[in-house]
UniProtKB/Swiss-Prot annotation:
Species this chain originates from: Rhodobacter capsulatus (strain ATCC BAA-309 / NBRC 16581 / SB1003)
Entry-linked InterPro entries: Periplasmic_diS_OxRdtase_DsbE, Redoxin, Thioredoxin-like_sf, Thioredoxin_CS, Thioredoxin_domain, Thioredoxin_ResA/DsbE_sf
Gene: helX
Entry-linked SUPFAM superfamilies: Thioredoxin-like (SSF52833)
Protein name: Thiol:disulfide interchange protein HelX
Entry GO terms, CC: outer membrane-bounded periplasmic space
Domain of life the protein comes from: Bacteria
C-alpha cells in the first residue's frame, strides 16, 4: 500500500508540468489573465510626450470607465488596432495612451501619420510603468473602472471581435 502512494507526488507534479506545457502551446496571450483584475491600478508613472502633461492616477479615478492602451510606433499589431482605437474614441470612449519603450520623435510621427485616439497620453521609455502593470509586450490594453480598479487586460490588438466580446460588455455593465 505504501509503494503506490510513494508515486503520487511524482504523478501530481507531472500533471502540473503537462498542464503548464499545454497552456503555453495555446498561443493566446489572453489565456493567462492578469493578476491585477479586480485590484486598484498600479501607479501611473509617465514622462510627457510632446507639450501636454501625461495622464495621472486621478484621471483613472474620475468615475468613468477608461481604456489604458500600451503601444509603440515600431509595433506592427499596434498599427492593426489603431483604426479600432480611433473608432472607440469616436464612440466617446476615453483612452489613455502609454507609449512603451519608444522614442518621442517616432511616437509623435506615428500619431501624426495615423491620428491620435488618446484622451491623454504619456511615455514609458524605461518600462517602469509597464513593469508595474505586468506588460509583456505591445499592444496591451487594460479596462479600468471609474474607481481606478482594473476590470480586465487584453494582450494583443483590439480587433472588432475583441471589442464586441470583451470591451463592449464591460462598458455596458453586462460583463460576467
Amino acid at each position: 500500500m505504501a509503494k503506490p502512494l510513494m508515486f503520487l507526488p511524482l504523478l501530481v507534479m507531472a500533471g502540473f508540468v503537462g498542464a503548464g506545457y499545454f497552456a503555453m502551446q495555446q498561443n493566446d496571450p489572453n489565456a493567462m489573465p492578469t493578476a491585477l483584475a479586480g485590484k486598484e491600478a498600479p501607479a501611473v508613472r509617465l514622462e510627457p510626450l510632446g507639450a501636454e502633461a501625461p495622464f495621472t492616477d486621478a484621471d483613472l479615478r474620475d468615475g468613468k470607465i477608461k481604456l489604458v492602451n500600451f503601444w509603440a510606433s515600431w509595433c506592427a499589431p499596434c498599427r492593426v488596432e489603431h483604426p479600432n482605437l480611433i473608432g472607440l474614441k469616436q464612440d466617446g470612449i476615453e483612452i489613455m495612451g502609454v507609449n512603451w519603450k519608444d522614442t518621442p520623435d517616432q511616437a509623435q510621427g506615428f500619431l501624426a501619420e495615423m491620428g491620435s485616439p488618446y484622451t491623454r497620453l504619456g511615455a514609458d521609455p524605461g518600462n517602469k510603468m509597464g513593469l508595474d502593470w505586468g506588460v509583456a509586450g505591445v499592444p496591451e490594453t487594460f479596462v479600468v473602472d471609474g474607481a481606478g480598479r482594473i476590470l480586465t487586460r487584453i494582450a494583443g490588438p483590439l480587433t472588432e471581435d475583441v471589442i464586441t466580446k470583451k470591451i463592449d460588455p464591460l462598458l455596458a455593465g453586462t460583463a460576467d
